[in-house]
């Protein structure tokens, strides 16, 4: 039996990235946009940047520029910023980047997450400010999470391999969205 060698996290991420880019499955999936604010963050420097090639940045920039409003994209905002600017940044994210109608926006499945870097200082005022910001974030998201839990919305069944349920197309037509794609799902297990 061959000896197994432990891989570093960077090597694992590199292998996963290569596998994702192979074949058509990656290119038919949902769009994910990562917005990193504050390039000096520890996670960004140690884990994110080493796994992304310079050419990937150019492709990502070209792709993001080609998106029509990016409304269907899942968005993750990674804040590697000093705590003093969290309030202003999260308010702007809430006002301009989150769906204003999240409850009824299940069709678009727009996801907006905010991740924060560990505190830059242990000063009691800074820690208190971050606690206040997190409480504000939970004040915004808790009612939404409770609503989702109360509704216990069941997924609409649809044919395996299809674009989704016909009700989704009907809703898109009612709100004025015209699907112009040529999506055709290919079962990766039968290739």
Curated annotation (Swiss-Prot):
State the UniProt keywords alphabetically. Acetylation, Carbohydrate metabolism, Cytoplasm, Glucose metabolism, Membrane, NADP, Oxidoreductase, Phosphoprotein
**Residues involved in D-glucose 6-phosphate binding:** 101
Q: Where is the active site?
A: 106
The answer to whether UniProt assigns keyword Cell division to this entry is no
Query: Where on this chain does NADP(+) 2 bind?
Result: 163, 179, 185
Annotated membrane topology is: Peripheral membrane protein
Segments crossing the lipid bilayer: none
| Modified residue annotations for N6-acetyllysine | 173
What task does this protein carry out? Cytosolic glucose-6-phosphate dehydrogenase that catalyzes the first and rate-limiting step of the oxidative branch within the pentose phosphate pathway/shunt, an alternative route to glycolysis for the dissimilation of carbohydrates and a major source of reducing power and metabolic intermediates for fatty acid and nucleic acid biosynthetic processes.
Name the UniProt record assigns to this protein: Glucose-6-phosphate 1-dehydrogenase
Organism of this sequence: Didelphis virginiana (North American opossum)
């Amino acid at each position: 039996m061959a000896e197994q060698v432990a891989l570093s996290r960077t090597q694992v991420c590199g292998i996963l990235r290569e596998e994702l880019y192979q074949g058509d499955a990656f290119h038919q999936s949902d769009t994910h946009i990562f917005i990193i604010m504050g390039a000096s963050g520890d996670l960004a420097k140690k884990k994110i940047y080493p796994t992304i090639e310079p050419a990937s940045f150019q492709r990502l920039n070209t792709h993001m520029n080609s998106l029509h409003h990016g409304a269907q994209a899942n968005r993750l905002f990674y804040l590697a910023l000093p705590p003093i600017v969290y309030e202003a940044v999260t308010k702007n994210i809430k006002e301009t980047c989150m769906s204003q109608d999240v409850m009824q926006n299940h069709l678009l499945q727009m996801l907006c997450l905010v991740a924060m870097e560990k505190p830059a200082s242990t000063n009691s005022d800074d820690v208190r400010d971050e606690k206040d910001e997190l409480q504000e974030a939970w004040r915004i998201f808790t009612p939404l999470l409770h609503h989702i839990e109360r509704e216990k919305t069941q997924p609409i069944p649809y044919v395996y391999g299809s674009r989704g349920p016909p009700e989704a197309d009907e809703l898109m037509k009612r709100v004025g969205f015209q699907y112009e794609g040529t999506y055709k799902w290919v079962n990766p297990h039968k290739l």
